[in-house]
């Protein structure tokens, strides 16, 4: 069964759910280490492009490395929902130090808010993926870019190599140019930013970007503490829900030996 989707940037196409043969993609450790699983899954399940949105691939297949991170994640959510249904259950631990209970939370993936790419952001992306803002404390202009699939694949290595300087490393990766600052001095400038400017810059990244809001509020069933968590996105995301797995176990146990 196929389904037509429109991604946050306007990219539209026909997708299908995962097939058994896609299991090899999920099980490929080398592919997982290189960050290529998402590209492989999307390439396998994207059947037809109906509207290229802000991208220009011509008659070629979609280069998922050039697609915005928000579009990629949205498409993955739709593939997962088409494969197993929109319900997604996952385990959590209560953040209340006096509780720490483990519990399961379930949500409908279709209920996650989606932020479309604005016309202004689309124009900036098409014209070189270059966005401009002015830092409130430093008072200088900064130019930055939105993350694509190629960046997404490099993120694990960046996090490993950044160590305790993850914020400055992430800023340095996204910031293209700082007014009056040479390329050799850009890293030092970013490390000397006030936290107010750093927070402002991260907010600007989000403001002009598109995608799915994955911050969700859950409530511990034991102590009723409300807490905000990020939607878990790991290998379990592409596996059947616990209800489906339980039904499989029930069928197996009731089968004649």
Range-by-range predicted roles:
Residues 1-257:
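Long C-terminal interaction/binding lobes of large macromolecular proteins
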């Amino acid at each position: 069964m196929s389904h037509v989707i429109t991604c946050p940037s306007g990219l539209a196409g026909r997708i299908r759910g995962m097939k058994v043969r896609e299991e090899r993609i999920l099980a490929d450790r080398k592919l997982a280490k290189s960050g290529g699983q998402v590209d492989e899954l999307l390439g396998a399940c994207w059947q037809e492009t109906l509207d290229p949105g802000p991208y220009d691939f011509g008659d070629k297949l979609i280069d998922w490395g050039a697609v915005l991170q928000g579009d990629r994640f949205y498409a993955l959510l739709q593939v997962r929902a088409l494969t197993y249904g929109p319900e997604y259950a996952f385990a959590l631990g209560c953040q209340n130090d006096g509780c720490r209970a483990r519990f399961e939370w379930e949500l409908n993936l279709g209920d996650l808010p989606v932020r479309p790419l604005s016309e202004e952001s689309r124009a900036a992306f098409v014209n070189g993926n270059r966005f401009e803002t002015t830092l409130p404390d430093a008072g200088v202009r900064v130019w930055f870019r939105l993350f694509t699939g190629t960046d997404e694949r490099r993120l694990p290595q960046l996090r490993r190599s950044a160590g305790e300087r993850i914020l400055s490393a992430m800023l340095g990766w996204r910031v293209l140019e700082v007014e009056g600052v040479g390329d050799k001095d850009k890293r030092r400038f970013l490390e000397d930013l006030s936290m107010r400017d750093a927070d402002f810059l991260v907010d600007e990244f989000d403001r002009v970007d598109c995608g799915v809001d994955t911050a969700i509020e859950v409530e511990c069933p034991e102590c009723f503490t409300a807490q905000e968590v990020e939607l878990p996105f790991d290998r379990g995301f592409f596996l059947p829900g616990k209800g489906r797995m339980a039904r499989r176990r029930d069928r197996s146990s009731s089968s004649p030996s």
